[in-house]
């Protein structure tokens, strides 16, 4: 069987030092403080590409020679989920310039893997000894702690015969012919489940750093294969796990692969790994042997028991990756590697020091890499910066070079726009190549550099400052072709077009009767995939997503190279499908493409009909005011005459675009004075209350004074009146 289970007995006895280890384990190890001394450095474009350190360990000075080894792509992302369960990309910036690997001078069988982003952090291995090194965070200087990692000798790894292909006892070591050196690249997506996240740091920065250490060590071990493991993306399940993580390893692997098929479609990767924490476990991992490039089986789970060191976990990850490439475990009596313990030795996770691949593993890899099963390792992702130092005049355009035609080539045909002596732009040149460069000058802003290819694409424009014409397209999930299909990565994922691409213009997308009839057979004519046991049965809900079934309306016999064409007459229609040999590089053409509509709000994904919510389409008509569509950055790409960002304002001469387009209009200045004047005219003045109080006090005082004056005058009048009456009375009495 292809399923590999790693059974580890006595694993709880395995010790080592890492931040996540138990205190009991720490007490066994000697920790010392050292100050690394940088003695040499080579830079390119302002960044170190080679560096040498002197490092004192237990009173002896060792010299570390290091070379830059990047493994992060430019679009590397770390994902998590918010409280609503919606996946988000964490806003963290990661440097791809500070990951190094190398060796210790004077020790041929040595290996150094460190990050220099914030001090030195990583592993040193020579002989059968391993050391860990980390910056001393409380130190104001460049002090580091260094410690010897000494895993105790626990029980050996055991393998059940029913689960693993052991190396044939009659295996013969054959000489390997020298081959042309070819670089290979494996892109992996790693998922860290909740308990694992909490165990190794419970902080996104700390956990990310530890995963980087795993990948760095894996790359150093895979160096003899000329294989670079690229961490394409990382995912944390911090609040809750997305699948059940209990149970044995093979069931967990099945659940993870099922989840992967539905939720990792738009995150580029060749393999996906789930890292799970367990207090104790019999198994340390599971994967499918030789299935690295089969998208249905390209995955693995690694179980991290409590006492396992980070270094041992890296060895487990390397063994799982090796098994998925078809490598077998070593027969220790027949396989040698020049160091005490080989990588594919069952005891490798228990050991310290350098572990290398044996001659048996080298031959296994040679067989794998020359087979059709290794096709996913042939593509070369862009890694920046390059660890190779640029040399002007060697005929190769390297990092930070505009041109390099070599001494002879430059003499015969001098390069335009470029100075061959410096490999930089020549005087007066603004650019040298690219769609937005013309005769060494940048094209003007707003000039079309790429027309829309179909309704799922958008037209791009030069921005006047770069020679690059960025590629944008309509957001995945947007309806197309009269709302029958949806857009996927800039193309209308039309079933009609799929059939015409295969069988010509006389073909069309098959009827539902054709799909239901043929994809229910689970044979060469129709199925939902191929597994180790043969053709996979299509459940009723998934039959529109299995083999691509087309209707054919021509009398000409179809002939496709390397493929078998199957005909069927169903309900009066000629239905056709095809079959490629297993492992053929065009075998994916015989399946319905991912993203093809298979029902209301459903699309095909890995031969299953699933809800389309994973596409994340969230662009309604109101967002762009019915005058635009959302692009792949979720910004409105407006129709002609409508201006971004929301397609509300109009300008007759504007051809359409988004805030990402090179023809973005400059924002018009806001009419400040009219706005302020209008604001004051439309509102009555609001005097502060404390300014009104004195006014009222004065009024009240004046009123009081008036009342008092009035009262006094009235009193005077009354007194005068009384005096007159008294005078008159006295006069009358005299008379």
From Swiss-Prot:
Residues 19-180 form a propeptide. GO terms for cellular component: cell surface; membrane; protein-containing complex. SUPFAM superfamilies: Blood coagulation inhibitor (disintegrin), Metalloproteases ('zincins'), catalytic domain. This is Disintegrin and metalloproteinase domain-containing protein 2. Residues 615-648 form the EGF-like domain. It comes from Mus musculus. Keywords: Cell adhesion, Disulfide bond, EGF-like domain, Glycoprotein, Membrane, Phosphoprotein, Signal, Transmembrane, Transmembrane helix. One of its GO terms (molecular function) is metalloendopeptidase activity. Expressed in the testis and testicular sperm (at protein level). The keyword Transmembrane helix applies. Residues 19-686 are extracellular. Disulfide bonds join 293-376, 335-360, 337-342, 449-469, 619-630, 624-636, 638-647. Residues 389-476 form the Disintegrin domain. Residues 1-18 form the signal peptide. The lineage of its organism: Eukaryota, Metazoa, Chordata, Craniata, Vertebrata.
């Amino acid at each position: 069987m292809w399923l590999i289970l790693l059974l580890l007995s006595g694993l709880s006895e395995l010790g080592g030092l890492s931040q996540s280890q138990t205190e009991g384990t720490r007490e066994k190890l000697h920790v010392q403080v050292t100050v690394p001394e940088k003695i040499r450095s080579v830079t390119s474009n302002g960044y170190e590409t080679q560096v040498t350190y002197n490092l004192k360990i237990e009173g002896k000075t060792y010299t570390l020679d290091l070379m830059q080894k990047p493994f992060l792509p430019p679009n590397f992302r770390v994902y998590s989920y918010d409280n609503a369960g919606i996946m988000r990309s964490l806003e963290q910036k990661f440097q791809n310039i500070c990951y190094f690997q190398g060796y210790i001078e004077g020790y041929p069988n040595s290996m150094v893997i460190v990050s220099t982003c914030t001090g030195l952090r990583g592993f040193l291995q020579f002989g059968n000894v391993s050391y860990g090194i980390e910056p001393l965070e409380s130190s104001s200087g460049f002090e580091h702690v260094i410690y010897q990692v000494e895993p105790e000798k626990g029980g050996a790894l055991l393998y059940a015969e029913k689960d693993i292909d052991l190396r044939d006892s009659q295996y013969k070591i054959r000489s390997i012919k020298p081959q042309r050196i070819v670089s290979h690249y494996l892109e992996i997506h790693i998922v860290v489940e909740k308990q694992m996240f909490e165990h190794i740091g419970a902080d996104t920065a700390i956990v990310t750093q530890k995963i980087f250490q795993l990948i760095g060590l894996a790359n150093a071990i895979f160096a003899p294969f000329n294989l670079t493991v690229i961490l394409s993306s990382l995912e944390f399940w911090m609040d809750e796990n997305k699948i059940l993580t209990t149970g044995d390893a093979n069931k967990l692997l099945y659940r993870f692969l099922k989840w992967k098929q539905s939720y990792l479609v738009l995150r580029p990767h060749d393999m996906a790994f789930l890292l799970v924490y367990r207090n104790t476990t019999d198994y340390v991992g599971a994967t499918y042997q030789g299935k690295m490039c089969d998208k249905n089986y390209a995955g693995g789970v690694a179980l991290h028991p409590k006492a396992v060191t980070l270094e041992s976990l890296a060895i487990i990850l390397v063994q799982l990756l090796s098994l998925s490439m078809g490598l077998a475990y070593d027969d220790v009596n027949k396989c040698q590697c020049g160091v005490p313990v080989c990588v594919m030795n069952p005891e490798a996770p228990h050991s310290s020091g350098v572990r290398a691949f044996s001659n048996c593993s080298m031959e296994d890899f040679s067989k794998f890499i020359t087979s059709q099963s290794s096709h996913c390792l042939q593509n070369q992702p862009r890694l920046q910066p390059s660890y190779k130092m640029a040399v002007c005049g060697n005929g190769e355009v390297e990092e930070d070079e505009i041109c390099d035609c070599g001494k002879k080539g430059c003499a015969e045909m001098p390069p335009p726009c470029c100075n061959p002596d410096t490999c930089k732009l020549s005087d007066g040149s603004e650019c040298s190549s690219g769609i937005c460069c013309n005769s060494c000058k940048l094209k003007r802003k707003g000039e079309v550099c790429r027309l829309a290819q179909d309704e799922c694409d958008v037209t791009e424009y030069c921005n006047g400052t770069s020679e690059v014409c960025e590629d944008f397209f309509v957001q995945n999930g947007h309806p197309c072709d009269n709302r029958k299909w949806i857009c996927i990565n800039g193309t209308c994922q039309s079933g009609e077009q799929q059939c015409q691409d295969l069988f010509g213009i006389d073909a069309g997308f098959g009827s539902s009767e054709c799909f239901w009839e043929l994809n229910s057979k689970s044979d060469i004519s129709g199925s939902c995939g191929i597994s180790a046991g043969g053709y996979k049965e299509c459940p009723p809900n998934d039959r529109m997503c299995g083999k691509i079934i087309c209707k054919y309306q021509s009398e000409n016999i179809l002939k496709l190279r390397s493929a078998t064409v199957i005909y069927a007459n169903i309900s009066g229609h000629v239905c056709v499908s095809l079959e490629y040999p297993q492992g053929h590089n065009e075998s994916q053409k015989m399946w319905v493409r991912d993203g093809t509509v298979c029902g209301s709000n459903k699309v095909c994904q890995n031969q299953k009909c699933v809800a389309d919510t994973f596409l994340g389409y969230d662009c309604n008509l109101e967002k762009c005011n019915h005058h635009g569509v959302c692009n792949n950055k979720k910004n409105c790409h407006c129709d002609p005459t409508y201006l971004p960002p929301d397609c509300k304002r109009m300008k007759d001469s504007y051809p359409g675009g988004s805030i990402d387009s090179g023809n973005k209009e400059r924002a018009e200045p806001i009419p400040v004075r009219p706005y302020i004047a209008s604001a004051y005219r439309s509102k009555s003045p609001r005097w502060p209350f404390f300014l009104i109080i004195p006014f009222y006090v004065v009024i009240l005082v004046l009123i009081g004074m008036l009342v008092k004056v009035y009262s006094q005058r009235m009193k005077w009048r009354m007194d005068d009146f009384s005096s007159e009456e008294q005078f008159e009375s006295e006069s009358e009495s005299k008379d």
